[in-house]
Amino acid sequence: MHLHFTPRQIVEKLDQYIIGQKDAKKAVAVALRNRYRRSKLAENLRDEIAPKNILMIGPTGVGKTEVARRMAKLVGAPFIKVEATKFTEVGYVGRDVESMVRDLVETSVRIVKEEMVVKVQDKAEEQANQRLVEILVPSPEKQSGFKNPLEMLFGGAQNSNQTSDTQEDVEIEKKRQDVERKLAAGLLEEEIVSIEVTEQQSSMFDMLQGTGMEQMGMNFQDALGSFMPKKTKKRKLSVKEARKLLTNEEAQRLIDMDEVTQEAVYRAEQLGIIFIDEIDKIAGKQSNSVDVSREGVQRDILPIVEGSNVATKYGSVKTDYILFVAAGAFHMSKPSDLIPELQGRFPIRVELTKLSTDDFVKILIEPDNALIKQYMALLATEGIEIEFSDEAIRKIAEIAYQVNQDTDNIGARRLHTIMEKLLEDLSFEASEITLEKITITPQYVEEKLATIAKNKDVSQFIL
């Protein structure tokens, strides 16, 4: 966990991936730092301080989800994103709101398990190599030297067998030492071996997914799993692939699942972040029977956000200290349309601004994972070096901004399809082009995207 970052450092880290939206970055940075501050308090005071949940308001594609996701990744906190529209009021068919907490705990278990596996990786690989040696040089089946029951009683023929067994064991040990040396030197990586691996069984309870009955299915499956033996099957693999599978199996045996569960539940409770998207879709006054469950979903979410105990297969989980970040465009409704009790549980409100042409220019070139860098890397695999002139980048940004203005504003996502359209012919012909270097100019951009920029009817089909 990396809770030691200062708010300024957190904002600087987020700036590497997200352009603009300073207010949102500051809000999440302070929320994260407050978790660190809370961890330093005396226990009696620590229990009194709950995180201040955040409501992000802004159109699609401006970075609401990305801010929360990058924040969680930065500190290694368990994080899940859910859509408010996927939940239904208790009593209706669909997912109940408590499933978001169960999903968070599952994510936390996965994170902790991966960390534990890394810690035991060396020992697991050592044991996997030992198993490979035993597979490559198997022990001979011991045959009984007794020919009749009387020899078992009086020990006849045993001494001669012991001598031959000892000689055979010495020879096998020599062979194994030789194989160990070759394995360490990487000389047997392509050798084919036959190993037994635990078979991954598809769950008969997968059909319950999305019905609100997943938890019941998982609990029943776990109960059955403790009685049913695990199935294994033989697979023929190269030593290199077999080592990966065997190392994973050994690592699973070495980690203590009770310790994993305990740490995972603690992290979910104290450090977990739940991002509730499209919360504006469940806001608004009930006007017809279709909207009947909107307020019901809000009232079901309320106790989770307020703080309650949710039953999971890993035990009861308290939601009092989970940070909730809700987001919505609020085109058709406004935050005040949420029920007052739920509004009060999101005291920090941040409005994200629409992206300008200058923002689009920065998005194209500045982030570590900038779009232009991605396309340059993709085409470089074909031996083609492409570069974009500053004027061409500005032209792309202007067209993306204009299409957003003329049609639906989908924010930075517009750049993805604009770039795809721009480089469509080049990507198609890349494997046949003999040129090693291509420069994208404003004229090239104009030629490829002119119809989109000028024709409103056409631009509606460019997402």
UniProtKB/Swiss-Prot annotation:
GO terms for molecular function: ATP binding; ATP hydrolysis activity; peptidase activity; proteasome-activating activity. Disulfide bonds: none annotated. Pfam families: AAA, AAA_2, ClpB_D2-small. CDD domains: RecA-like_HslU. Keywords: ATP-binding, Chaperone, Cytoplasm, Nucleotide-binding. ATP binds at I19, G61, V62, G63, K64, T65, E66, D277, E341, R413. GO terms for cellular component: HslUV protease complex. The keyword Cytoplasm applies. The keyword Calcium does not apply. It is found in: Cytoplasm. InterPro entries: AAA+_ATPase, ATP-dep_Clp_protease_ClpX, ATPase_AAA_core, Clp_ATPase_C, HslU, P-loop_NTPase. One of its GO terms (biological process) is protein unfolding. Signal peptide: none annotated. ATPase subunit of a proteasome-like degradation complex; this subunit has chaperone activity. The binding of ATP and its subsequent hydrolysis by HslU are essential for unfolding of protein substrates subsequently hydrolyzed by HslV. HslU recognizes the N-terminal part of its protein substrates and unfolds these before they are guided to HslV for hydrolysis. Belongs to the ClpX chaperone family. HslU subfamily. A double ring-shaped homohexamer of HslV is capped on each side by a ring-shaped HslU homohexamer. The assembly of the HslU/HslV complex is dependent on binding of ATP. This is ATP-dependent protease ATPase subunit HslU. It comes from Bacillus cereus (strain B4264).
